[in-house]
Amino acid sequence: MGFIDGDKVIPSTKRGAKGEMETVAEQVTRNCVNARSRQNREKDKAIELLDIQISNNCLDENKILILNADELSVSNNLTGLIAMGIAAKYKKPTMLGRISPDGYLKGSIRGREESELKDFKSFLKGSDYMDFVEGHANAAGFSIKESDVSKLYDYANKELANVDFNEGFYEADFVIQGNYSEIT
């Protein structure tokens, strides 16, 4: 297997650009940007639907969010990305999954490392309600009996009663222009 020369000129695969030429690098870049845009549209649509679930069920009153993605028409491959978006928006550890035929909620967790709860995975394991939680401290796969979800909410609300997930958290979003050496 060899390397592909990014400067090599090839026929464009861009819609409406029949007969035009572009470099491999241009084509790969365009395809990646388009894939990311599709992924973001799906993620944003899913987050909007989950916002309704959270609002209708007053789930944001809990210390953690446990959400059901069964009604979402998005790929299972985006579960972690969507959970990360919800965790960032609500500033709470989030579990997002789908109900399996055997009655388990299975999916992805995303924690908030900048909060007092540094290891969401260990917290969940310590509850004794989880079938499994495997992965990183704040990004992992999980499984819990659907019947244990309310028990986990009770456990989390009690154990995390004094944790303020907004405390000490400041979101900054800005663009720096110019020479980085000018920043002091």
What are these regions (language model features)?
Residues 162-164:
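The C-terminal output helix
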Residues 182-184:
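Long, low-complexity segments enriched in small/aliphatic residues
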Residues 1-154, 167, 171-179:
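Hydrophobic helix-and-loop "lid/oligomerization" segment in the mid-to-C-terminal part
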